[in-house]
Amino acid sequence: MATFISVPLKKTSEVDLVKPLSKYIHNTYPSGEDQTEYCRAVDELNKLRKSAVGRPLDKHETSLETVMRYYDQLCSVEPKFPFTESQLCLTFTWKDAFDKGSIFGGSVKLALPSLGYEKTCVLFNIGALASQIASEQNLDNDEALKAASKFYQLASGAFSHIKDTVLSSLNRDPTVDISPDTVGTLSLIMLAQAQEVFFLKATRDKMKDAVIAKLANQAADYYGDAFKQCQYKDTLSKEVFPILAAKHCIMQAHAEYHQSVLAKQQKKFGEEIGRLQHASDLVKTVSSRYDEYVNVKDLADKINRALTAAKKDNDFIYHDRVPDLKDLDPVGKASLVKSTPVNVPLSQKYTDLFEKMVPLAVQQCLSVYNQRKSELINSTIAQMRDATIFANGVLASLNLPAAVEDVSGDSIPQSILNKSKTVIEQGGIQTIGQLIRDLPELLQRNKEILEESLKFLDEEEATDNDLKAKFKDRWQRTPSTELYKPLRSEGSNFRNVLDKAIGADAVVKERYQSHREAIVILCKPEAELNAAIPSANPAKTMQGSEVVTVLKSLLNKLDDMKKEREQLENDIKSVNFDMTTKFLTALAQDGAVNEEAISVTELDQIYGSYTYKVQENLKKQEDLLNNIQSAHQEFSKMKQSNSEANLREEVLKNLAVGHDNYIELVANLKEGTKFYNDLTDILLKFQCKCSDIVFARKTERDELLKDIQQSIAREPSAPSIPQVPSYQSAPSSISTNIATSSIPTPAPRTVFSAKQPPPRPPPPAMPSASPVPASAAQASNPAPTAAADSSQPPSNTIPSQAQGPPYPSYPGYPGYYGMPMPVGYNPYMYGQQTIPPYMYQPPSGQPPYPAQQPSFSYPQQPFFPPQ
């Protein structure tokens, strides 16, 4: 009777995890020990998948342990990699576990780029393998009974978990085997079998009949519920339904039997007989309907023996009234089983291969934090650099410090010499010219990469739209138009960035042209530089004046402030703080990370003091520039004013401004070159991302096309089978066939008119024909139609050949016997005529052949009637 239901495993196609995961690791994590370790872990994960789902598995706990370790690893990997169609696209293909396939195509399968789908299918295999291991247990000992119950409850929990999560994991209709209805039924079946195992253990341990009856009745209840859930569905194999119905009756019979024993102990002999009669009826039902699936002979014998003895005792001794079945109290229920919840890790030997890799949520928080940090640092540094540029502009407009250095009127001020030296050391006009010439080439390279990336998306999207229009509702996958929205948005952002870069390049070129003449002068040797600066009358002796001393002091303080800002910039850039621990702690405590609150607080603590120092420095510079402008006004009043001095001062101002713009332009051009080079790397990654998703979509498209072709092949070519021709179904006379058949009537054969031969002697009787009296033979052959009718096969056999017009026969000569033809042979497909050959006629008066001697047989051709 111990017939248990086990679930077949799902089968999958091979998937290369190494290439896409390693590629993501190389693009995301810097080279070093962590990157090498993560790539090694990817190799181990790929091997683990092959061991868990890529080969046939033994029905043993070690195989189950391997599958559970793979499931645990999937749960660990899921939050650490962006498994989405638009980022890290891995397509997993699984076949329906219950579909046997057809002659027109393979079994039903589903391919989805979803790690949740992979987890669901692996969990299904955990439940299936657990059910197989439980079914293989030898239930003759306690350890095997405990193991079977444990594995059945594990299988029930796995199927129940799939029922609750499959729709949210897939976001589309799953295959039938993992649909909520199917796995819900499987979970209930596994629970019923676990309860039955407890019933068997209680019976083996000879527990009280009241307890055993409750356990059996609860098992019957589980089996009944499972049968109700699946009796109108064609999802499980056909053997499952009768087994569930039989188990329901059997466990109910056990419950009634043990309850009858309890009634006997309580001296309720009528109730005992009533329950035994009900148990006997249940067993008879199983024997009559489900005998090929379960054997209940021993149970039936035990119940019948008890029933016979109870009736005998009651008839002779007790005379207790036997109550009707409806009047019996229902048997109690006691459930000792429950679905084992799916709590990761399932495996006791699990070790996380990616233990050091932080979850994707933390990675995203770190990315946002680093962006906030960069924005804060860049804005602070930009403030300091803008302050320096502003101060240099003010000094250049006042011709400082050259004005206080140029007292002779014909020598080059030291500050101008220093500026000229700086320009020459940085490459002069050649460097800035080369940087400007390189920009268009770098820009064009980035534009080509971006256009090529978007072209990948456009071509695949056009193909997807064409197939959607062709197959309509059959084309069930995420439309490329919707899937590529994030990538197209990213591409649009890149295009805007390039447009802004083009505008910035134009501004840089315009500034270069405005100050090119001053920069060219600064690049000249000292003698040529001195000649390019107009001379003026010597200024009044002002070296010892108080205003010059004040100006020089103020200028020195301004230089100190510039140096202070440079030091602050270096200090701010050198600050480094790892937020991983804080984000991981928040994730562990709250289950989520409030990145903004944590990041703002930490950034304020780390950079608050630097921000304060920068603001103090800027405030001091503002006051200092005001003092410099006031002192310069007094200095200007003291200087001798003439046209030559004014012209010289104007040239010196232009040279100072040219120097400042040269430094700024070189910095901008180098920054622009770095920007384009960095953007090239980013665009190459974007191109790679587009290429990867297009390749994954093409693979998914090929799988879907294959599935659609197989589904089309499995569909019937017509709504119903046409009516079978009459000559293939019921053997009847030609006249009846022609009159009743609904198919077109074939044209009759051509019968050649020939001279009637003289009567021939009767041939010997055919071996297959039964002996017939001469009178009967004459009566049966009055006309050709009669002869034809006599050659018809019995009505309950398939005709030996296709029917055709009857051939003439002669008195005393039975119609010819046709050679058996293959069933379905159609004589109308061939143009030959079958006419009986002319047989030798003896001269008149010659005696006929003796009856015991056979006549001469002519040679026969294949497929022609024998003579």
Swiss-Prot record:
Gene: pdcd6ip
Function field: Multifunctional protein that may be involved in endocytosis, multivesicular body biogenesis, membrane repair, cytokinesis, apoptosis and maintenance of tight junction integrity. Class E VPS protein involved in concentration and sorting of cargo proteins of the multivesicular body (MVB) for incorporation into intralumenal vesicles that are generated by invagination and scission from the limiting membrane of the endosome. Binds to the phospholipid lysobisphosphatidic acid (LBPA) which is abundant in MVBs internal membranes.
Broad class of where this protein is predominantly found: cytoplasm
Chain residue ranges for the region called Disordered: 714-809, 835-867
Lineage top rank: taxon: Eukaryota
Post-translational modification, as annotated: Phosphorylated on tyrosine residues.
Protein name in UniProt: Programmed cell death 6-interacting protein
Cellular component terms per the entry's GO annotation: bicellular tight junction; centrosome; cytosol; endosome; extracellular exosome; Flemming body; melanosome
